[in-house]
């Protein structure tokens, strides 16, 4: 019996923030390119050096990220023309998502020899644990305590 995979689940059908986020960052190469941009990688050759990715696939992902408004490109060399890829405001707003994924990976996907990556807050120099908190009461958010409703 042939089993067909669904392209999405009902919660992700239609126009939803989850579906849009998965379309932007759900591909492993795209997610890696965005993550590297948060680590100040800007040039095609730098992305290619860090990722075991074919150049045509990298070029496609960068083009897609520009089209989606996550990156913009800026020339840094004229002959031949070469570009740096910078996060837009929309792209920078993905940082909490990537920070959460990094922390989850440190906790659940490590080698058992401690966190593979420690985060430091530059202005104060202390270790950092990113948290998602309610902007009204300051409590840390727990999924079972969050409900959804259609925006009015």
Residue positions per predicted region:
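C-terminal regulatory/oligomerization modules of transcriptional regulators
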Residues: 1-2, 106-152
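N-terminal helix-turn-helix DNA-binding core of bacterial DNA-binding proteins
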Residues: 16-57, 129
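Short aromatic/hydrophobic contact patches that present stacked aromatics
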Residues: 50, 84-86, 118-120
